[in-house]
Amino acid sequence: MATLRIRLQVPKKYRDQPLMGDVLASCQLQFNILAAHLGPNREEDGWFDVMLTGTSEDITAALAVLRDRDIELWSDTEDEF
C-alpha cells in the first residue's frame, strides 16, 4: 500500500456535492481528512489536507479525476503520482 498526503482546493461550485467521498471511494482509496476549511455559507473555495492510502495505481487514478475536475493539488513529496 502507498500513502500520499495532499492538499487540495475545491472550487465553490462543488460545495454541495460529495466530491471527495465519490472520487476517492470510486478509486478504492482510504482517506483521512487531516484539516479542512469549508462551510455551507462560504463564498470562497474550500481547502482540504488529506492522507490517501491505496495502491499507487489507484492514487494516480484519483489524482487524475480530481485534476480533470479542476481541483488544484499540492504535495510535499517527491513521489510521482
Swiss-Prot record:
Gene3D superfamilies: 3.30.70.260. It holds the Pfam family NIL. SUPFAM superfamilies: ACT-like (SSF55021). It comes from the Bacteria. InterPro entries: ACT-like_dom_sf, NIL_domain. The keyword Cell membrane does not apply. The keyword Translocase does not apply. Keywords: Sulfate transport, Transport. To Synechocystis PCC 6803 ssr2439. May have a regulatory function. This is Uncharacterized protein Synpcc7942_1683.
